[in-house]
Amino acid sequence: VAIVERERHLGGILRQCIHPGFGLSHFKQELTGPEYAQRFIDQVRTTDIALFLDSMVLGIDSGKPTEDTAVHTVTLMSPTGMLQLIGRAVVLAMGCRERTRSEIKIPGSRPAGVFTAGLAQRYINIENLKPGSRAVILGSGDIGLIMARRCTLEGTSVEGVYELMPYANGLRRNVKNCLDDFGIPLHLSPTVTRVIGHD
């Protein structure tokens, strides 16, 4: 078994989710995202699973199946150069990608300072960068609510969270802990229809 990871560290998106709320069902303990990921990383490191970190899969080719099994060749670029792994099965565990602005149908110019919630979260929690001094958050799912609180804690003035639906999409506890406790307004039913800006 081998794990190919494009980042330098295992853990995926959990590394930037520094808020608690993970691990309750699996470990019967409330953990942050990095703590939760580390539990699994520690388990992996006790095995003979080969780890290819800071590596990018370039292609997956399937050969002709034999009577017993199919053969797959995974070509990857690693810090040591190009490698090929051969196996009977390939599991794509790539997480998810956030929808871009064009995918959620928001027209307008493309100025700097418009981020997906995940990118803003990475900037703050991993890169130690502040995305801006003022923010408006579109969407009241849990990540939007958590980022409203996180931005506020980092000194960004969050003008409000705007939700297209007439109700918040995140957990009620997150509305209370992330918005109500910090005085961040939640605007239900309006949404962004256009982005206007320069640079």
Regions found by a protein language model. Name each.
Residues 39-76, 152-199:
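A Rossmann-like FAD-binding core segment of flavoenzymes
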Residues 13, 62-63, 101-103, 146-148, ...:
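Short glycine-/acidic-enriched loop or helix-start segments at secondary-structure transitions
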Residues 40-134:
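FAD-binding core/adjacent interface of flavoenzyme oxidoreductases
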Residues 1-39, 43, 131-177, 185:
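Beta1-alpha1 glycine-rich phosphate/pyrophosphate-binding loop at the start
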Residues 6-7, 17-18, 54-56, 77-79, ...:
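Fold-independent oxyanion-binding glycine-rich loops
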